[in-house]
Amino acid sequence: MAGAAEDARALFRAGVCAALEAWPALQIAVENGFGGVHSQEKAKWLGGAVEDYFMRNADLELDEVEDFLGELLTNEFDTVVEDGSLPQVSQQLQTMFHHFQRGDGAALREMASCITQRKCKVTATALKTARETDEDEDDVDSVEEMEVTATNDGAATDGVCPQPEPSDPDAQTIKEEDIVEDGWTIVRRKK
């Protein structure tokens, strides 16, 4: 009996890790180092912390799980999740925990497998989109380069714009009487 409980806990742990690894908000935080130089280690620790949280609290409500995950992401990764994924991930974790409590290893395996497959599809799509975006940016860069080397009256400017010279030096100076006590400057029309 202890072996079955150990197997179910290992399956629950794998499911928690799969759900967290497939969570885009967490992955963005990890990839961009929002948790500091140890973001990868914090993400692994997060899986264990979530598992322990469920093991210590048998009757968790969905909002309690959301609050716990939100607090961990805020404290450890300086990330506030506002994309609507927090309730989804919380629901997945809670469903997995219910399967764990019933000892339904097959359902745990199926959920973890489904989450992993979905993550692979999203990753493949994201890579394809990123490559297309890079190609589009190359096109924009070349257009911008052409604009920078445009000529002005037959002479190349190389992206440097000549500064206009003031026409009347007296018009550019600010008179002391135009400065008000609050630090504001009164602007008057040219005569």
Swiss-Prot record:
Pfam families: WGG. The keyword rRNA processing applies. GO terms for biological process: maturation of SSU-rRNA from tricistronic rRNA transcript (SSU-rRNA, 5.8S rRNA, LSU-rRNA). Residues 149-172 are annotated as: Disordered. InterPro entries: Pre-rRNA_process_TSR2 (IPR019398). Keywords: Diamond-Blackfan anemia, Disease variant, rRNA processing. One of its GO terms (cellular component) is nucleus. May be involved in 20S pre-rRNA processing. It is linked to Diamond-Blackfan anemia 14, with mandibulofacial dysostosis: A form of Diamond-Blackfan anemia, a congenital non-regenerative hypoplastic anemia that usually presents early in infancy. Diamond-Blackfan anemia is characterized by a moderate to severe macrocytic anemia, erythroblastopenia, and an increased risk of malignancy. 30 to 40% of Diamond-Blackfan anemia patients present with short stature and congenital anomalies, the most frequent being craniofacial (Pierre-Robin syndrome and cleft palate), thumb and urogenital anomalies. Belongs to the TSR2 family. This is Pre-rRNA-processing protein TSR2 homolog. It comes from Homo sapiens. The gene is TSR2.
